[in-house]
Amino acid sequence: MHTGGETSACKPSSVRLAPSFSFHAAGLQMAAQMPHSHQYSDRRQPSISDQQVSALPYSDQIQQPLTNQVMPDIVMLQRRMPQTFRDPATAPLRKLSVDLIKTYKHINEVYYAKKKRRHQQGQGDDSSHKKERKVYNDGYDDDNYDYIVKNGEKWMDRYEIDSLIGKGSFGQVVKAYDRVEQEWVAIKIIKNKKAFLNQAQIEVRLLELMNKHDTEMKYYIVHLKRHFMFRNHLCLVFEMLSYNLYDLLRNTNFRGVSLNLTRKFAQQMCTALLFLATPELSIIHCDLKPENILLCNPKRSAIKIVDFGSSCQLGQRIYQYIQSRFYRSPEVLLGMPYDLAIDMWSLGCILVEMHTGEPLFSGANEVDQMNKIVEVLGIPPAHILDQAPKARKFFEKLPDGTWSLKKTKDGKREYKPPGTRKLHNILGVETGGPGGRRAGESGHTVADYLKFKDLILRMLDYDPKTRIQPYYALQHSFFKKTADEGTNTSNSVSTSPAMEQSQSSGTTSSTSSSSGGSSGTSNSGRARSDPTHQHRHSGGHFAAAVQAMDCETHSPQVRQQFPAPLGWSGTEAPTQVTVETHPVQETTFHVAPQQNALHHHHGNSSHHHHHHHHHHHHHGQQALGNRTRPRVYNSPTNSSSTQDSMEVGHSHHSMTSLSSSTTSSSTSSSSTGNQGNQAYQNRPVAANTLDFGQNGAMDVNLTVYSNPRQETGIAGHPTYQFSANTGPAHYMTEGHLAMRQGADREESPMTGVCVQQSPVASS
């Protein structure tokens, strides 16, 4: 407690200090505004001289150090003064005075927003169930964890939602306009549930990985532009594409597209699978089907694969129940480990369906699916069934060690004996195509169908180890020039962008393809293995006259050195393969070693895969799961109008042959070391010669040698090394690819076909 004396003693000092401090502060303010004034400056302050300081009373003189101490603080305060000022209309004083009514209204809108959403959500419910009504995600979601899409809604001051264009187990896809980029996009809205969010995050990671390896976007994978969180939903923004291949089939009344167009789709798909098989990616799509293959433009044949929501990388498989049932591979049905080969099986099923118009294996359940596969391909090999955990779900083992089909419990379904429903007859190889609808058409000769059938049989090999790989599939004669120019869409051997990369250190140095995800997903009510995969039809379909479908991609040069083919897990393959070339030969196609009986001579009448000419009849309407496919009536008046062969321009680059004569080639394998291609020239042949010598087509000699050893790369992948002899390559010109000129393009037979298109804008 202060005494009175102490208080009175302090007062005179306080009275005298106040004016002196204010005086010096004023002087300091003037000094601070002058240039080069600083606490540590060597220059004297002009405001107060030494004589002035000495003339001041003692109490004023002791304030000079205080002056030097305060000056920097004032300078800092001046520097912090704002240079720009806010709009007076937003000032708190204005909001709480003249705009007070507006302020209260805004507070009420924010406060009652949640209550208003709850009220709107429950308006359509029965009044008796009001107590049971629940609100999800503050009224933004429905009871299925899906975002409630409102047309015209604007997100983040950027995306204007136009309409819902797809729905699936993952969530929804909406069409939206991006105000920043000024383009239409497809936004995939993931369900607001942790399991779906986790899987979508894997999808984003895979898509970004593919984007990184494909800056030019030329490998037929959809492009992921960006992703963000909005109201607890992960949203993936994709490029806008056109309708899917199932829509295309539906618009042909399920009669199928031409073999030429099927070839274009097949080559792009094989290129995409080759890209996914690069060691840096090793991605398994796990759900290839017509609904997940979209046209880039309704008047072009360019396609892209979408929906990587079920995808995984090799060695990171987390699901056992994958793939849509019609396209599910035998190893998945049998519960065996799977790899990238399951996508090749799906592709084989898709290509047949695209040409015939109907699924090749349309099982109503897994047992029915396996039985329909066996009808066409026979009983799977014993060495596969012996290792299959679920083999006894479909088959029973006989005392002699062989396997046979189990009898169905209901006894209602009757199947043809194993292997008697021949692919030869399904495709109509010698009867004018499926249902005879392609008889006499250009590009649908017996030779063309034989090549197509052989490629499909290699894709549908029961054994994933010997199932054809994308690298070899792209070299198949189905994609090559024949003596009959009308049988192909290009004048020469077709290659894909993935085949153009040069070999570097035993791997492909690639830019690769991006984007996957599910943009513009299907709206069809197609039967699926998973009932949650049903897609709703969205209204507003419109008809578009498709006159020509051309693929527009890059036209890089083809190098003479092929990349190393990318093997699949467990594949027995040579560690080094030398391709022998001769000036008068044309390389046909490579096959994996130890092909099974499916790949043998098809012209041998004693061979058990010789296809007799039995016609496959359709009895009425065939129920396919949850949908019924329309019956196809073989009317000759409709055959020309249903040709959908979209013309490809320069997209599928081809290597020009130096010789158009009927030629052959051989592929030989050798071990590593200096022995070169002489190592196994005398080994017994593991596959017979395949002869396509019909109707002017070339003869193809396949010579396959077994391999005594295997080098494994990453994740069980065999390591391949390919080299071409330095002699003149018979399938290319000097260093370049002779590109097909526009004048040589065949007339598109798509003119006048009316195609019903999904309401998805084409990019």
UniProtKB/Swiss-Prot annotation:
This is Dual specificity tyrosine-phosphorylation-regulated kinase 1A. One of its GO terms (biological process) is regulation of amyloid-beta formation. Residues 159-479 form the Protein kinase domain. GO terms for molecular function: ATP binding; histone H3T45 kinase activity; identical protein binding; non-membrane spanning protein tyrosine kinase activity; protein serine kinase activity; protein serine/threonine kinase activity; protein serine/threonine/tyrosine kinase activity; protein tyrosine kinase activity. Keywords: ATP-binding, Kinase, Nucleotide-binding, Nucleus, Phosphoprotein, Serine/threonine-protein kinase, Transcription, Transcription regulation, Transferase, Tyrosine-protein kinase. Residues 46-61, 485-501, 634-645 have a biased composition (Polar residues). It comes from Mus musculus (Mouse). Interacts with RANBP9. Interacts with RAD54L2/ARIP4. Interacts with WDR68. Interacts with CRY2. Interacts with SIRT1. A motif (Bipartite nuclear localization signal) lies at residues 117-134. Its EC number is 2.7.11.23, 2.7.12.1. Inhibited by RANBP9. Detected in brain (at protein level). Expressed in a variety of embryonic and adult tissues. Expressed abundantly in neurons of the brain, spinal cord, and retina in developing embryos. Expressed in the entorhinal, temporal and visual cortices and the hippocampus of the brain where is colocalizes with SEPTIN4. Expressed and extensively colocalizes with SEPTIN4 in apical dendrites of pyramidal cells. Also expressed in Purkinje cells in the cerebellum in postnatal day 1 and adult mice. It is found in: Nucleus speckle. Residues 33-61, 115-136, 408-442, 485-540, 596-679 are annotated as: Disordered. InterPro entries: Kinase-like_dom_sf, PKc_DYR1A/1B, Prot_kinase_dom, Protein_kinase_ATP_BS, Ser/Thr_kinase_AS, Ser_Thr_dual-spec_kinase. Gene3D superfamilies: Phosphorylase Kinase, domain 1 (3.30.200.20), Transferase(Phosphotransferase) domain 1 (1.10.510.10). Residues 598-620 have a biased composition (Basic residues).
